[in-house]
């Protein structure tokens, strides 16, 4: 379940459908991409309708529509067969539903309660950390009025029950393993790699053995990339034991006491792009390695459409460097927008509306 099973089933089924109907892997991916595009377009359209429902000025709705239409991140994600697109749509719908719950005047209808539960289940199914994002934000509903508190408790209980039943009963029943723990250990792994790179002579033989049990000590320094955790964590030993993990963290803590600054440097180097607007972490794959073709498939680009593909790809690659408007797809800039809006709500003492930002900040954190 490292890559969510539900998304794998959907993507795999549609690829198989394309192969069965048209003898083409490309056709299957096209079917999936069209369905995903419809989902994204429908979600973005819903945001504009919702803005109208809460009396947002037509001027701002038009600006939103222009951004959706012209900023390349939206069409590129629409056609990318990855779990994050549908998950992103679900989070948008969840935040809107969260707004409605926060501003609910009367009793929560059973129909709306069921729809909220179904939405939460989908979020959990499409992203492993979706559970934490939803659960933490749901708890704040308990402080917003007694009228619906029992129903909110039911929603929270069902959310927790489903999450643990799915991961501890349903997936094991079908012999599906949970995602690797390495995903939540990116930060300490990067810190260890930087420590080894900078203070290799100080690493004892016992420390080497403890690190090697998890991360292949011999190559960890050369694999270390300050801005990217994948090269280090990709060598994680999936056959580790609890003792291996315990011994590693003993070493991690010992090295922290010796050189705490290197841990701080490693963390900043790996995360500063999330808060630094000058940094551009934007890449577009116009063409790439078709690894899937090594396994009996025939995935290829349409050669006749290459000129159009190059024009659209060129626009996408250039967009981040267009003055001012290029910042729209800059992660650091968007983080500062969130912080600015949060500060504004504090200034205006709109404390209830601050709760709406919890899912967005949790996504940044996890």
Indicate where each model-derived feature is located.
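Transmembrane-helix motifs of polytopic, lipid-linked glycan transferases
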Residues: 34-55, 93, 340
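Membrane-interface anchor segments at the N-terminal boundary of transmembrane helices
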Residues: 27-31, 35, 269-361
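Short helix- or helix-capping micro-motifs
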Residues: 61-72, 92, 96, 120-124
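Membrane-interface alpha helices of multi-pass inner-membrane proteins
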Residues: 112-127, 138-141, 156-163
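Extracytoplasmic catalytic/substrate-binding loops of multi-pass membrane glycan-assembly enzymes
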Residues: 1-14, 27
